[in-house]
Amino acid sequence: MAFVPAPGYQPTYNPTLPYHNPIPGGLRVGMSVYIQGVASEHMKRFFVNFEVGQGQGADVAFHFNPRFDGWDKVVLNSKQNGSWGQEERKMSMPFRKGAAFELVFMVMTEHFKVVVNGTPFHEFKHRIPLQMVTHLHVDGDLMLQSINFIGGQPPSNQMPMPAQAYPMPMSAQAYPSPGQYYQQQSRLPTMEGPPAFNPPVPFNGRLQGGLIVRRTIIIKGYIPPTAKSFVINFKVGSSGDVALHINPRMTEGAVVRNSFLNGSWGSEERKVSYNPFGPGQFFDLSVRCGADRFKVYANGKHLFDFSHRLSAFQRVDLVEIHGDVTLSYVQI
C-alpha cells in the first residue's frame, strides 16, 4: 500500500544520485531539509547545493561540500553569475566514512543553520534571496536514504512550521511501556501542533484535540549502536490506558506492539515484513489513525497495521517516547 505524506511533509526515499529536483513550494523561512544517508567507505567528497534553477551554470545560494582529502574540512560557498564567492571553511569533519548520518538545513531569516547528527555545525549567511532558490542538488560519495522537505507547501489553514524547537507540554505521568501511534489515511492526512526539533528523551507530547481519524504523527530519530530498546506510547492521560504501544527491541530484532487497557496488557503482535530499527540506523516513522486501525509506515514503507482495541481511541491525548533512542523531529 502506498505511503501518502501529510501536508507540509514532503519525503523522498532511497533517491538515486545525482539528486537534482525542485524544492516543493520553493524555499522559504521556516523550512527544514532533512537528508539521511551513509557516507561511502572510500568517501572523498560530496556536496549539497541550493540552486537557482536547474541549468548547468545555475547560481548556487548555498554550497555545502565535505572533503576528505588529507585535510578533512567542509567548504561552504555560493555562486553568482558564474563566479564562486568567498569560501568559508570549517576545519572539522562531522561525517565518518561508512557511517550513517543525518544532515539538516534549517532556513532562518538571516542564514542557513546546519545541524549534523543533532549537533549544530555552522551558520551560513544568505547571499542570494531565498525566494530565488528553486532546486536541491546532491551528489558525490554517499548513498542517500531519504530527503525530507518539512514545512513546504503548508495548507491554507496552517501557519508555516517554525525552524526552532518548541517545548512540548509535559505530562505528569510517564507510562513505563512502549507504544507507537499510527494513523490510517482515508482521504487527506492532517498534522496539528508545532514541531519539536531535536527534543529530549523522554519525550511527552500532548495531542491537542485528541486522536482523530486521518491524523498523522511523524517521528524521526536515530538508534544508538548500543541501544537495547525504546518505547512509543499513545496514551489516555486520565486513565493510563495505552491504545498503541510500540516497542522496538534491538536485542531481539523484534518490533513488539500491544495495548494496555483497564490495567492489563493485551496480546502481543510481532509480525513485520522488515525491521527498520537497527543499531546505528536512522528511522522515519509516520503514524496514521484510521476509523478501525492504526497504519504505521517506516522510511516510506508499510510496516504494520494495528486494529483499534480501545474503541474510544479519540480519548488518546498523549504521545510518550522513552528508552534508547535519539529524536531529531517530532510532529504531533
Swiss-Prot record:
Gene3D superfamilies: 2.60.120.200. The modification Phosphoserine is found at residue 267. Disulfide bonds: none annotated. Galectin that binds lactose and a related range of sugars. May be involved in the assembly of adherens junctions. Contains two homologous but distinct carbohydrate-binding domains. Monomer. This is Galectin-4. It comes from Bos taurus (Bovine).
